[in-house]
Amino acid sequence: ASGCLGYHLDCMEHLGGGHNINQTKLFELALNNGFDPRTQKQLGPKTGDPRTFTSFDQVMDAYYKQLEYFVPVMHKVKMLSLATEITDGPMSGLRCAMQYEDCIREGLTPKEGGARYPEGRTSWLGSRGMVDTADSMAAIKKLVFDEKKVTMEQLLDACAKNWEGYEDLHQMCLNSPKYGNDEDYVDDIYDELSTKVPEIMQRWIDPITGKKPMLFIGAAAGHIALGKALGALPNGRLAGSPTCDAACSVMPGMD
């Protein structure tokens, strides 16, 4: 896996196009049985009402099922984008080809194999919002299942109301274990995600290169747009606010 910065040989290797998945959005869908509170639409599969869950494992399973559903959808979008690039004709990759000496010499665009190292033609998949997802899972595990200080009903209602009227619970969630502070409680959850999520996302093979896509775990400036698509989260984050930036940054103010 790579973070926000991918390393490539200058003017010799080209990384193919890719798409991103907002992991935190998938987790939000899992907490709402596949229903999106923001658009008021059933976007994902019905993975169970979390209010009826009796273990944290059920929460994780619901999230993984959402991911398994949306990964093929993302790949279909990728193929549609590629089809558009192909129908655009030879001009579609000309600007990029002008940056590669090998492409100029061979008269081929990077996607046609003009770059010196064609391995770079593989697609990439971006896994965004991993830190917020892990932090939110840790809050649920600690407060709902381990310590039983709140019910899932109370926590989900607090998120739906953007913590209004739930100020004490909001502070409890903000003070729950946060990734990046050397706390095994949440780091172990992130470790599981960083293993399981790539395994699910890389089940797909690029039909053009015949290779598994390269996985990026990051956000870059995308954390602002990602946050606008989200409601409040169990980690204490407010609705519409940015998610954690970069690849592995701690929640702002929590390191």
Which residue stretches match the model-derived regions?
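Conserved catalytic cores of very large enzyme subunits
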Residues: 1-255
